[in-house]
Each structure stands twice: as structure tokens, then as C-alpha cells.
């Protein structure tokens, strides 16, 4: 998703000052090579392992995190951003409202953000298509009996993180064990998993 996100920033007059990645095939390249778009930007992709050491020198106002879907997978990057006073927004689905799925980690990150006078938030497809759009339609209805939805998109456009949490490539048995079964728990078990930070939100 960073390919598109970087383009959006540039198209809207934003300035990209740093880029980080885990993919060794991208590290050391100018972001223009990653985007396959536009002129050279003189922003070289750095190893994510160097982020804690180099982010401060970038003087970034905000970080856009387009890597993973689950809050626990984003903890390190959010923490680095917070400790450097950098605001952060992610397209990671759980971060849209993680207080009910991973309250302990959400509280921890909230305190880091407040201590360094910055903001962490989640927004993206789920914000518009699963939230705001539905609420707007409901507001025009005289009465509502039930709401059903279906969502489809090309996983190839969203990277490995999204493909993984959707179970792409798994056989039926593996899909049932790793993806489907996590929602087949009672409320007490779900609460236990949430408190332990091990709950996989159903929107995955």
C-alpha cells in the first residue's frame, strides 16, 4: 500500500522526508523506484531496524504506517514515533478502534503519545466503507431492521499483511484453524483473549 500512499502524499502537496521498510529488496532505493512513478525524490528507503536511530533527524510531522493489520504488530513502530514526538496514522484495521480488542496495549500506546504530545490513530478503508458510509446511509433511513454488508477487493493491491490475515494460500483445514476458529469462541473466552492481547478482531 505504501506505493499508493506515497503517491497520494505527493499529489496533495505533502513532502516525504523518510521511508522505512523490512523488505531487503527495497532498502537503499529511492522511493521513486518503489513507486515506479515520477522523478527522483532523493529519499532513500532505510531499514526499519534503523528507524529508532534516524527518525529524529528526518524532522517528520507525521508517519503513515502501511505495514500490518494487527495492533501488536505495530507496537514497535508506534512506540518509536511517539518517543520522537512524531504523530502517526495507520491503515492497520485494528487501530481504527482497538480499545475493545487489545485494551492493555492501546492504553500503553495512548500514554506514550500523550507523554510526547503527539497523536496515534487508525483510518482507511474500514473508516470510510465500514463506518462513515454506513452511518451516512443509516441517517437517511426512517427505520432500520438489520444491516448486512459484503466487502471484496483484490488482495494483490494490499500486500502480504492483508493476504495473511485473510488466510490467502491456506488449505481448508489450515484456514479453519488459523482464521475461522478465532471467532468461534464464547464471550468469556473472547474477553480473556482481549485482556491478554491475543484476540484477532472479527473484521479480519
Language model features: what each stretch is:
Residues 90-91, 120-123, 148-149:
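General beta-strand structural signal in soluble alpha/beta enzymes
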Residues 22, 68, 92-96, 125-126, ...:
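Short, ordered loop/turn segments at secondary-structure junctions
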Residues 1-84:
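N-terminal glycine-/serine-/threonine-rich beta1-alpha1-beta2 phosphate-ribose binding loop
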Residues 114-143:
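Short alpha-helices
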Residues 15, 87, 119:
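Residue-level detector of anion-binding/catalytic polar loops
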Residues 73-75, 79, 84, 92-118:
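Rossmann-fold NAD(P)-binding glycine/threonine-rich loop
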Amino acid at each position: 500500500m505504501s506505493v499508493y500512499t506515497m503517491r497520494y502524499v505527493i499529489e496533495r502537496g505533502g513532502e516525504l522526508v523518510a521511508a522505512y521498510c523490512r523488505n531487503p529488496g527495497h532498502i537503499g532505493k529511492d522511493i521513486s523506484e518503489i513507486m515506479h512513478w515520477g522523478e527522483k525524490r532523493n529519499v532513500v528507503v532505510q531499514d526499519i531496524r534503523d528507524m529508532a536511530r534516524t527518525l529524529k533527524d528526518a524532522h517528520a510531522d507525521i508517519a503513515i504506517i502501511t505495514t500490518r493489520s494487527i495492533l501488536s504488530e505495530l507496537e514497535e513502530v508506534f512506540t518509536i514515533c511517539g518517543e520522537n514526538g512524531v504523530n502517526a496514522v495507520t491503515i492497520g484495521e485494528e487501530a481504527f478502534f482497538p480499545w475493545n480488542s487489545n485494551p492493555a496495549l492501546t492504553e500503553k500506546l495512548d500514554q506514550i503519545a500523550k507523554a510526547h504530545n503527539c497523536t496515534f490513530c487508525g483510518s482507511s478503508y474500514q473508516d470510510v466503507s465500514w463506518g462513515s458510509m454506513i452511518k451516512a446511509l443509516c441517517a437517511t433511513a426512517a427505520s432500520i431492521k438489520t444491516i448486512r454488508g459484503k466487502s471484496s477487493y483484490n488482495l494483490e493491491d494490499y500486500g502480504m499483511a492483508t493476504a495473511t490475515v485473510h488466510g490467502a494460500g491456506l488449505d481448508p483445514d489450515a484456514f479453519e484453524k488459523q482464521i475461522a476458529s478465532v471467532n468461534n469462541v464464547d464471550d468469556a473466552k473472547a474477553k480473556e483473549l482481549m485482556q491478554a492481547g491475543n484476540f484477532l478482531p472479527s473484521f479480519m
